[in-house]
């Protein structure tokens, strides 16, 4: 969780703040702003009354699995991969006033709506890869619209006070 906190602080939160978004929802590896931010009709968002339908989980439980493939042709592949490779992890609570952790659920129609062409303010990051010498790497991306965004590897060091971002390595920018 400390790795995710450091990555969110260094990569995603500044971009959402720069664009004037309010709270942020982390959903199945995808970051989506809560509705109520400025100009909500221009960005995909999750309304507070939708939170129950998305089955918010306790802050200490998070299901990690492969996600992100879209389109009906890929649905079966994604579900098959997730069924073979999913695993449950119990994580300490990520206490943030502006971040909510939601249990990844099957959101084919929601994902389609949230990642519609021209949408802005979507981001996400991979599960961290750890080294034995106290480092971690995370793949992070931020999409600010059609043909707008970037992706990078985030290298973190484990110090006495926790994980800190050491550097980011840009992979692509649009």
Placement of each model-derived feature along the sequence:
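Flexible low-complexity loop/turn motifs enriched in small/helix-breaking residues
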Residues: 1-150, 171-174
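Short beta-strand edge/turn micro-motifs at domain boundaries
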Residues: 155-173
């Amino acid at each position: 969780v400390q790795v995710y906190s450091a990555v969110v602080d260094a990569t995603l939160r500044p971009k959402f703040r720069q664009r004037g978004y309010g709270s942020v929802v982390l959903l199945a590896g995808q970051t989506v702003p809560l509705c109520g931010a400025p100009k909500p009709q221009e960005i995909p968002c999750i309304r507070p009354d939708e939170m129950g339908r998305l089955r918010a989980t306790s802050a200490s439980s998070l299901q990690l699995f492969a996600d992100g493939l879209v389109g009906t042709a890929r649905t079966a592949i994604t579900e098959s991969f997730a069924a073979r490779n999913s695993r449950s992890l119990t994580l300490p609570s990520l206490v943030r006033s502006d971040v909510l952790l939601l249990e990844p659920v099957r959101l084919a129609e929601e994902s389609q709506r949230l990642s519609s062409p021209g949408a802005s303010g979507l981001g996400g990051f991979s599960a961290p890869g750890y080294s034995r010498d106290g480092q971690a790497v995370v793949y992070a991306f931020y999409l600010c619209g059609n043909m707008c965004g970037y992706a990078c590897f985030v290298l973190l060091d484990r110090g006495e006070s926790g994980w800190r971002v050491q550097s980011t390595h840009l992979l692509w920018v649009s």
